[in-house]
Amino acid sequence: MTSLSVHTDSPSTQGEMAFNLTILSLTELLSLGGLLGNGVALWLLNQNVYRNPFSIYLLDVACADLIFLCCHMVAIIPELLQDQLNFPEFVHISLTMLRFFCYIVGLSLLAAISTEQCLATLFPAWYLCRRPRYLTTCVCALIWVLCLLLDLLLSGACTQFFGAPSYHLCDMLWLVVAVLLAALCCTMCVTSLLLLLRVERGPERHQPRGFPTLVLLAVLLFLFCGLPFGIFWLSKNLSWHIPLYFYHFSFFMASVHSAAKPAIYFFLGSTPGQRFREPLRLVLQRALGDEAELGAGREASQGGLVDMTV
């Protein structure tokens, strides 16, 4: 990650440096909280992975966010310390590769979740009868493999990680990334709009929303918090001009995007008046829409937060 710090004694620059340091410090703290939240979500989702196919998606999303936040925290340390600590080029490139890889994986998984949930809501009979048993597992595996391939191609063409870079191929690949980012965003917007219309106008509008609401909130979270980081990547590699403050702002919003998802899961699944007093496992099940198992689970909820096992 190239340092964009400007060292000068002018008052305006001193103000910018103070602002940037504040944003980066908040980013570190938020990333630390996100690591804890995603770690808990990852552990709980692993207990529930065979009960709900959508939990497989969220398990992969939590894994991608966990890796992203780890790399994100480490990568901004030189910026936070005003370049008093510099990583070797190998570490710098590796952190860049991993962050971009996890970002694209998370975006692709979110598009897959919104698409499958839209199909399940619009065509429930077809979805239950025709859906392949291992569809979710295959889609997740395909996303990880294809995103890894794209990341390796970009690393080989745009850096010296695997040898001499090819700048012409690098520009072409980043144009492909721009098209991919636009296509995934359009997919999420269209499927989320259809899902919202179905939820608000369908016969089930007075029933508990559960997972469809979670998907809608996750898409909104990406559009407002995750998308700026993608724009930063494109502007950096396609020579678009962006203000310096947007550079650090996109870092902060990327941390918000990855750290806020576990909070959405638990607040959406918690019962008003019982928040922070229910077992986290039951809260997550409710957010996933596993209402069938919650009847017996409500009795167990008297055990408190420590009851987190299946």
From Swiss-Prot:
Give a Pfam family name: 7tm_1
Q: Which GO terms describe its molecular function?
A: G protein-coupled receptor activity
Gene Ontology CC entries for this record = plasma membrane
Any idea where this protein resides? Cell membrane
Residues annotated as glycosylated:
20, 237
Described purpose of this protein according to its UniProt entry: Orphan receptor. May regulate nociceptor function and/or development, including the sensation or modulation of pain.
Q: Which family does it belong to?
A: Belongs to the G-protein coupled receptor 1 family. Mas subfamily.
Q: What is this protein called?
A: Mas-related G-protein coupled receptor member E
As recorded in Swiss-Prot or TrEMBL, the protein's gene is named Mrgpre
